[in-house]
């Protein structure tokens, strides 16, 4: 039952995030919808981590460059799931 609830909440968050809702909205929803327990802590951590990732980075090659040009006027580089502006990948 808990697994179904987690999957349902996650899919709902993904759907709502495409409508412009931000991490703070989801954190507030999890706080009121899920009773205080380990499950709530795990969900809040997942919401935070998903909120910090930029999935467009790995799916669309020009995403980071567009993102960094908009905010810092620098060249963008994809580091895993995060964009770094002006910091090339170093191996």
Swiss-Prot record:
Coiled-coil regions, chain positions: none
Tree of life domain: Eukaryota
Organism (species): Mesobuthus eupeus (Lesser Asian scorpion)
Pfam family, one: Scorpion_toxin_alpha-beta
Function comment: Has a low affinity binding to potassium channels of rat brain synaptosomes. Displays weak antibacterial activity against Stenotrophomonas sp. Strongly inhibits the development of the Plasmodium berghei ookinetes. Displays slight hemolytic effect on mouse erythrocytes. Induces cytolysis on Xenopus oocytes at high concentrations. Is not toxic towards mice and towards the insect Tenebrio molitor.
A single cellular component GO annotation: extracellular region
Protein name per Swiss-Prot or TrEMBL: Potassium channel toxin MeuTXK-beta-2
Disulphide bridges: 57-78, 64-83, 68-85
Domain BetaSPN-type CS-alpha/beta: 54-91
Signal peptide coordinates: 1-19
């Amino acid at each position: 039952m808990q697994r179904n609830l987690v999957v349902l909440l996650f899919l709902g968050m993904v759907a709502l995030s495409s409508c412009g809702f931000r991490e703070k909205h989801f954190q507030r929803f999890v706080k009121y919808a899920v009773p205080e327990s380990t499950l709530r802590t795990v969900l809040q951590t997942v919401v935070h981590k998903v909120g910090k990732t930029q999935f467009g980075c790995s799916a669309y090659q020009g995403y980071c460059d567009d993102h960094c040009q908009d905010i810092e006027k620098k060249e963008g580089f994809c580091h895993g799931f995060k964009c770094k502006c002006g910091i090339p990948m170093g191996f």
